From Swiss-Prot:
Gene Ontology MF terms in the entry: carbohydrate binding; metal ion binding
Lineage per the UniProt record: Eukaryota, Viridiplantae, Streptophyta, Embryophyta, Tracheophyta
Gene3D superfamilies registered for this protein in UniProt: 2.60.120.200
Name the UniProt record assigns to this protein: Anti-H(O) lectin 2
Subunit composition and interactions: Homodimer.
Residues holding Mn(2+): 127, 129, 139, 144
Glycosylation sites: 115
Length: 243
């Protein structure tokens, strides 16, 4: 079967089920840290962590496309002053298994400097953008959840109130893809409120048959350095016939 399912209640610093690029690593506390902060690091700091085994998201032979569900918890650790806000965000992504770590900072490790659509990326991501700054001309100008398809400019964004989120408040994320309707839905829940949105994405048109799945995180040095930390992760995908 090309179906896949896994669950991490926490992460093992010595485990073999994740691969890393850039500044991503598992801490001794069992937390998956997507990027570091500190002195002696580049201005833009990023990292990727992905599940070690690629899986089939669609089949050219049968026409099947996978539906999936994933859930995880994350929090933002800001320094030196949480009142300054956070930067730049994290993503949950599907991409080619050998895709590189690209530009960090506001590009979140998935894309290069151009915000033009580029089908060679073969990447679909849900981004949790904590900045949305006007300086990032591709962003809507406010912090947001966005869906990215082969470009850093989201095809749809939903405003998120990240203020008051910088003191290790835990976010609960639930993301689903329904193959029959090509509907990608992302839900972000904090103790006080919930944000969710859905958008149509054609996986066959935008992803290779086999993909890897994981997370990226990125921050920019300059007073709002943030580590993006994943506490746990569940993922399950099933190939099914298109209706």
């Amino acid at each position: 079967s090309n179906d896949i399912s896994f669950k991490f209640d926490k992460f093992d610093p010595n485990g073999k089920q994740l691969t890393f690029q850039g500044y991503a690593s598992v801490l001794d506390t069992g937390v998956l840290q997507l990027n570091k902060v500190g002195t002696g690091l580049p201005k833009e700091i990023g990292g990727i962590a992905r599940y070690v085994a690629p899986f089939q998201i669609w089949s050219k032979a049968t026409g099947e496309v996978a539906s999936f569900v994933t859930s995880f918890q994350f929090f933002l650790e800001t320094s030196p002053n949480p009142a300054n806000g956070a930067s730049d965000g994290l993503t949950f992504f599907l991409a080619p298994p050998n895709s590189p770590l690209r530009r960090a900072g506001g590009y979140l490790g998935l894309f290069e400097t151009s915000n033009k659509s580029d089908s060679s990326y073969q990447t679909v991501a849900v981004e949790f953008d904590t900045v949305g700054a006007p300086a990032n001309t591709w962003d809507p100008g406010y912090p947001h959840i966005g869906v990215d398809v082969n470009r850093v400019t989201s095809i749809k964004t939903t405003k998120e109130k990240w203020n008051k989120r910088y003191k290790r408040e835990v976010a609960n994320v639930w993301i689903t893809y329904q193959a029959s309707s090509k509907t990608l839905t992302a839900s972000l829940t904090y103790p006080q409120d919930q944000t969710s949105d859905s958008v149509s994405v054609d996986f066959k048109a935008n992803l290779p048959e086999w993909v890897s799945v994981g997370f990226t995180g990125g921050t920019t040095v300059g007073g709002r350095e943030t580590t993006h930390e994943i506490l746990n992760w569940y993922f399950s995908s099933t190939l099914e016939y298109q209706t």
